[in-house]
Amino acid sequence: KVICHRSSLSFDPLEEMIKLAHKKGISIEAWINPYRISLNKNTYQNFMELSSKKSWLEDTKQSIGYATYKYIFNPESQDVRDYIIAGVKEIVENYEVDGIHFDDYFYIEGTHGETTQGQRMDNVNMLIQDVYQSIKSINSNIVFGISPQGNYENCVNEGADVDTWLKEDGYVDYIMPQVYWSDQYGPDGKTRMFTDRIELYAGLKRQKTVMLYA
């Protein structure tokens, strides 16, 4: 399921990283971009050569193309959800990771089609819930977190329902927004972009069991 260079190596890179990290008392999480298929010609060709799901690129129920060589898995598809969950379980069952971490790409501009914002959030939320439950059913000590976009409005528009993830059980253990801007933002360097974004996230309703990291 995983495209890698393992077959050409005499060792498993992820396994070795976990061993090295744990020896030094460092926790290690597997960072996953759940929906992304390809970003350019090279990654597209790799997917077509190595993936068992290459036929999905010809099926709009399973994938969405939004530019030349750029595809994501269709978040609306149950087959896609099952495939992503199987990949997560493969990691959790075979490696001593301390957590699973999702990147900020869910829907992408150009992939919305006829969906509403609410439908996009519902489709993504089904995956998030199922991933959380799958992880906890295998090992309740493994955490599940997401790094949504630093721009809250973009998150919601692209299907990342951060409000629900923060305030309801069964979605995530933490979120870590990708706030990459400084407090010297803009042409005049006077916009407090980092502080403004962090304060926005900190102001969202959140249950105590869900952590917010910056």
Which ranges hold each PLM region?
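Hydrophobic residues within beta-strands of alpha/beta enzymes
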Residues: K1, D98-D103, I175
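Surface-exposed substrate-engagement region within the catalytic domains
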Residues: E168-Y171, D183-A214
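Active-site-adjacent "subsite" loops/lids of carbohydrate-active enzymes
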Residues: H5-K19, E29-A30, Y35-N94
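The substrate-binding groove and active-site-proximal loops of carbohydrate-active enzymes
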Residues: V2-S10, A67-D82, T115-N123, Q178-G189
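Substrate-binding cleft/loops of secretory-pathway carbohydrate-active enzymes
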Residues: L39, V143-Y185, K190
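Short, acidic/polar
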Residues: Q78-I91, N154-D169, F194
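Generic structural signal for well-ordered alpha-helices
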Residues: L14-I18, V88-V92, M121, N125-Q133, ...
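Aromatic-lined carbohydrate-recognition surfaces of secreted/lumenal glycan-active proteins
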Residues: H22, I26-L39, V88, H101-E109, ...
